[in-house]
Amino acid sequence: MAEKRNIFLVGPMGAGKSTIGRHLAQMLHLEFHDSDQEIESRTGADIAWVFDVEGEEGFRNRETQVVADLTEKQGIVLATGGGSIQSKEIRNNLSARGIVVYLETTIDKQVARTQRDKRRPLLQVDDPREVLENLAEVRNPLYEEIADVIVKTDEQSAKVVANQIIEQLGF
């Protein structure tokens, strides 16, 4: 596995992809990228605005392009958006261009970690738990399908999880 120098983090909202990714990149002396932040940088607007103006399809099109561009880089850690996994093109790019690490977490942890975050358009509903459960049903099999490594993030700090990833990858 060590021949692939890119590490791509996938998983649901609230799994810790961005936080763990920053630690991982720092520990491995790699560049860190977050696909959502890159979309915001390119559009000059936040994700919620892109969803409002362009809808989910417009956002997903932007996400596909951003992930395609970022996965062509070498020596990066990339935190992907939770829904990016639903794109076959993104799954193919992630699998072909790096090591895919699935950060697995429970619905309870997702709810706890995302409940105050107003920047998550899909969760701005009366029952975010139901949304997260429905998303998990669709997305979890896709995360598992492309994962080279699966790491649970529920009860551990981001730094501990980053260390576990490094150990599992043999870096």
UniProtKB/Swiss-Prot annotation:
Physiological role: Catalyzes the specific phosphorylation of the 3-hydroxyl group of shikimic acid using ATP as a cosubstrate.
Quaternary data: Monomer.
Family: Belongs to the shikimate kinase family.
Any one annotated GO CC term: cytosol
Pathway: Metabolic intermediate biosynthesis; chorismate biosynthesis; chorismate from D-erythrose 4-phosphate and phosphoenolpyruvate: step 5/7
Protein name per Swiss-Prot or TrEMBL: Shikimate kinase
Binding site for substrate: D36, R60, G82, R139
Binding annotation for Mg(2+): S18
Gene3D superfamilies per UniProt: P-loop containing nucleotide triphosphate hydrolases
SUPFAM superfamilies listed in its UniProt record: P-loop containing nucleoside triphosphate hydrolases (SSF52540)
Keyword Magnesium appears in the UniProt entry: yes
EC numbers, comma separated: 2.7.1.71
Lipid metabolism as UniProt keyword: no
Alphabetical keyword list: Amino-acid biosynthesis, Aromatic amino acid biosynthesis, ATP-binding, Cytoplasm, Kinase, Magnesium, Metal-binding, Nucleotide-binding, Transferase
